[in-house]
Regions:
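Anionic N-terminal interaction surfaces
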Residues: 2-135
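Acidic, Ser/Thr- and proline-rich intrinsically disordered linker/docking segments
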Residues: 3-27, 31, 38, 63, ...
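Residue-level detector of short, conserved catalytic/binding motifs and their immediate flanks
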Residues: 141
């Protein structure tokens, strides 16, 4: 986990400083817990409207005016899309020889064309298509993705839906500039931070927020045993 801290000299929140690492190892504390604890700290400041107290994280990404980089780390994403357009080119052939040879040749060609047609139809069906591994910069307003061949941003305000589909996986649904629906699944140690920011700012009635299930069960107790207080952010503030 990259070094992350929240706050200034007063009211510092650093998820790694107060943890008793020896005890933490005994209870199975991992890098994932570090990221979850940091996310809890960010959410605590977010709901209190005190994001200005958060220490900005270093980033190579050009930020917008007054944008605050909260985290940056590895990310792999997959796009829900077809890998083909359904087109295929039938192959024609000419065969000469005995009747049985010509019949066999045409049968083989027909089977090959049938296979091409089926493959084209299969490639037309949408599926999750992984992109090259890259990284993500998470701010209070968006997530910026980049890999060797592509860069793009998803703004929380532009989302139609968000869901935390695994401990380190988040799914976004939104519309591109022409208005076409898009779906993106992201695997990243910062997936829970992406979800928390998007949900708290744009989806306050999200079932994972209302149920408190966006945080792992027993996480607060785990923090207590490890010697680190956890902000009370499991449930939305009344």
């Amino acid at each position: 986990m990259s070094e992350v801290a929240i706050g200034g000299a007063e009211g510092m929140f650093d998820p790694g400083v107060e943890i008793d690492r020896l005890i933490a190892e005994q209870i199975g504390w991992s890098w994932f817990d570090d990221h979850v604890l940091y996310t809890c700290g960010v959410v605590d400041f977010l709901v209190k409207k005190q994001l200005a107290r958060i220490r900005a994280q270093a980033t190579r990404i050009r930020l917008e005016a007054d944008e605050l980089c909260l985290a940056e780390g590895p990310a792999v994403w997959s796009v829900w899309q077809a890998v083909g357009d359904g087109s295929w080119a039938p192959r024609t052939m000419y065969a000469s020889g005995s009747l049985s040879f010509v019949a066999a040749a045409h049968l083989g060609n027909a089977l090959a064309n049938q296979s091409r047609r089926r493959r084209a139809a299969h490639e037309l069906q949408p599926r999750w298509v992984p992109a090259r591994p890259g990284a993500a910069m998470v701010s209070e307003r968006r997530v910026f993705f980049h890999n060797p061949g592509h860069t793009f941003s998803i703004y929380w305000s532009g989302l139609d839906m968000v869901d935390l589909i695994g401990p380190d996986r988040v799914e976004f649904r939104y519309r591109d500039l022409p208005g076409k629906p898009q779906a993106l699944q992201v695997q990243s140690p910062w997936a829970i931070l992406m979800f928390a920011l998007a949900a708290h700012t744009q989806f306050p009635n999200h079932p994972l927020l209302l149920s408190g299930n966006w945080l792992p069960a027993g996480f607060e107790d785990k923090c207590h045993i490890a010697g680190k207080p956890c902000p009370h952010v499991r449930f939305p503030s009344p």
